[in-house]
Design a protein with these regions (language model features):
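Amphipathic, well-packed alpha-helical segments that form the structural scaffold of globular domains
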Residues: 4, 8, 30-34, 38, ...
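Polar, glycine-rich mid-to-C-terminal structural blocks
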Residues: 274, 286, 291-364
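Conserved functional hotspot residues or short segments at active or partner-binding sites
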Residues: 1-8, 338-502
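Conserved phosphate-chemistry cores used by DNA topoisomerases
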Residues: 13-19, 248-252, 300, 333, ...
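A generic structural motif
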Residues: 68, 133-137, 337
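Extended, domain-scale alpha-helical bundle/helix-rich regions
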Residues: 1-62, 67, 71
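Cleft-lining beta-strand/loop regions that shape enzyme active-site pockets
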Residues: 18-23, 43-60, 76-81, 85-87, ...
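Conserved catalytic motifs of ABC-family nucleotide-binding domains
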Residues: 95
């Protein structure tokens, strides 16, 4: 009933506004055309383009709150970013209802039962100020004027931790995306942020380092190249070939390394694009042990261009202003290849030490997507010097022995096979109870263990975190999540094995 009510409200919102209806039909049509070329060519209305770029940026111009439309059509505030304009106003609180919006031009916009995308369009508009009317839980109405400000994107923050297991210290850095500053607002870049975390972790006396790229869907290719260069002295990182063009070698832009010790990279089926670039490059150099399950298999390059007949790509400087009303297109320009000439396209990166993962049962990879571009190779002379081969066979044997004695991974392997069977069965039960059981098997997960090892921050971060209650709470949650992760534990043990074997 709730789902039906949501659909009914959405359709009613669209149909009540002719312009919104025209936009909805136009968006569907243009998205369908774009998707017929390859999975990553996509039409973006202006607000979707902004949201996409924001997801890959460390800082954005925002008001600093998120909304949710309830089943009855009311729009509620569900979270507020500390330090943002909404937070600093002191007049907007979680669970407040958003009643109306007044733009800088004086246009009043009713909020209840707003059509999908209508509010997104308002908040992503280049206009830097709005007046909101909110209603608190006691019924009080408050008018709040907000001015956009630079707000940190918490989801893209790089955080480094020390993992202590059996008296050995391993550095751990999770990288959620290859973000960068897209415009004049600047902000941090992921390669630079990772380098800073490594410096702090080295001061803690780490003996090895884990870079977690699981669920990292990619982002800025230049950042991926710079990140790879942190771990090698100099040399080529990837080969790129645009449609009809020659193959170009892209190299590490800086000589020297930030970290030259034992390195492991965690990947899974949702590690894509730039993540695969980094994992593949460091694998080809024998620089890192790749741990986990096969990656997604995307090795294509995209760029976002305006649908504006006055725009000339050949004369672009990056400072042009565009007609945003026509939208934008994210278009595939070419393919990325490994320095060996091989490709991760469709194939993904094969881990050196494989760990079972339920994500393998979903079969959601580049290969499964309609119109995915084929995999091929390129012939180009590339000169690079690999490090000595890693003791992969010994690492695989030791890891396999541990997995065979691990109740968690034994249960996980069993569940993986069961889930694969259920997923392969295309017969969906229509009886409610049978469907519920079928769905539970599809979405089943193994309960994480708890407190597998000690996790703590570098001393520099600890002092800063203690100054902020919100930061302290979020940090405690992250530490707990890491310490309960059996994949991180096994990866840390593999790093300990590597250190022992190389001694």
């Amino acid at each position: 009933k709730q789902l039906a009510a949501n659909y009914k409200r959405s359709f009613a919102g669209i149909l009540s506004d002719q312009k919104e209806l025209n936009n909805a039909i136009s968006d569907i049509y243009l998205k369908s055309i774009a998707a017929s070329y390859d999975p990553h060519t996509e039409f973006f209305p202006a607000e979707e383009k902004d949201a996409f770029e924001e997801s890959l940026s460390s800082n954005n111009m925002k008001f600093g709150f998120t909304l949710n439309q309830a089943n009855d059509g009311d729009v509620e505030v569900v979270s507020i970013v500390p330090g943002s304009p909404a937070w600093n106003s002191g007049s907007i609180h979680v669970n407040d209802k958003l009643v109306s919006i007044k733009t800088a031009g004086g246009r009043e916009i009713p909020v209840k039962n707003a059509a999908p995308g209508q509010l997104d369009s308002v908040f992503s508009d280049p206009s830097q100020s709005l007046e909101l009317t909110v209603q608190s839980s006691d019924g009080k109405l408050t008018a709040v004027k907000l001015q956009k400000a630079l707000v940190s994107n918490e989801e893209n923050f790089v955080k480094g931790y020390v993992i202590e297991l059996e008296g050995k210290k391993t550095g751990y850095i999770a990288l959620p995306s290859f973000y960068s500053g897209w415009d004049e607002n600047g902000g941090g870049s992921c390669a630079n942020d990772v380098a800073k975390e490594i410096v702090k972790l080295k001061k803690e006396g780490i003996e090895s380092l884990l870079l977690d790229l699981r669920y990292n869907g990619g982002g800025n290719v230049e950042e991926a190249i710079e990140l790879s260069g942190i771990f090698i002295d100099a040399g080529p990182i990837l080969l790129a070939k645009e449609t009809g063009g020659k193959t170009t070698t892209l190299k590490d832009p800086s000589r020297g390394t930030i970290y030259d010790g034992p390195l492991g990279i965690l990947i899974n089926g949702q590690s894509a694009s730039a993540s695969e670039l980094v994992a593949g490059a460091l694998q080809d150099y024998n620089r890192a042990v790749i741990i986990g399950s096969n990656s997604f298999g995307k090795a294509t390059m995209q760029s976002i261009l305006p649908i504006d007949t006055t725009f000339d790509l050949n004369k672009a400087t990056g400072k042009e202003t565009f007609n945003r009303q026509n939208g934008f297109v994210k278009i595939t320009l070419g393919k990325i290849y490994r320095i060996t000439g091989g490709s991760n396209q469709l194939n993904g990166v094969t881990p050196d030490v494989k760990l079972p993962d339920l994500i393998e049962a979903t079969d959601y990879t580049e290969r499964s997507l309609p119109y995915a571009l084929p995999s091929d190779t390129v012939m180009k002379k590339v000169f690079y010097t690999t490090l000595k081969p890693l003791p992969l066979q010994q690492l695989q044997q030791r890891s396999s022995q541990r997995l065979a004695g691990s109740e968690y991974f034994k249960d996980l392997s069993k569940q993986l096979q069961e889930t694969k069977k259920v997923t392969a069965d295309n017969n969906v039960p229509l009886q409610w109870e049978a469907y519920r059981q079928w769905r539970e098997k599809q979405t089943a997960h193994i309960q994480n263990k708890k407190n597998l090892f000690k996790v703590y921050n570098a001393a520099f971060d600890t002092k800063l975190i203690e100054l902020n209650d919100f930061e302290r709470e979020q940090n405690a949650i992250l530490q707990k999540t890491i310490s309960n992760d059996a994949f991180v534990e096994e990866a840390a043990r593999i790093m300990m094995d590597l250190k022992t074997i190389n001694q």
